[in-house]
């Protein structure tokens, strides 16, 4: 398993020379497993460039949005795979917070 933090900037994207070390994108994390499954946690601004890569590779993706704050969703409309039905599969939508605790990722 490999976990990569792509967006750690906070509520407002702020790319530029002063943010090069840690990046300027808002929240999103990529989890890659050995069986080629991928999970994206949240949908911050850096998601756009990752989406371009996944479109080229024709890679399937699972996305979990932790909550609806702007810094966690603002990259979502620009994530190209959501506009390609063959790469998108919406399985669950949880409205009950206690139910989310029961969700087991990558269970077969």
What residue ranges belong to the model's regions?
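Binuclear metal-dependent hydrolase catalytic cores
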Residues: 1-108
């Amino acid at each position: 398993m490999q976990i990569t933090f792509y967006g750690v900037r906070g509520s407002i994207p702020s790319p530029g020379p002063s943010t090069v070390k840690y990046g300027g994108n808002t929240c999103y994390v990529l989890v890659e497993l050995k069986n080629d499954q991928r999970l994206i946690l949240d949908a911050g601004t850096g998601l756009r460039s990752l989406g371009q890569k996944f479109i080229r590779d024709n890679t399937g993706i699972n996305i979990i949005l932790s909550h609806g704050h702007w810094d966690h969703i603002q990259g979502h409309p620009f994530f190209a795979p959501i506009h390609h039905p063959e790469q998108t599969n919406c399985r669950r939508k949880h409205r009950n917070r206690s139910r989310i605790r029961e969700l087991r990722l990558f269970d077969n």
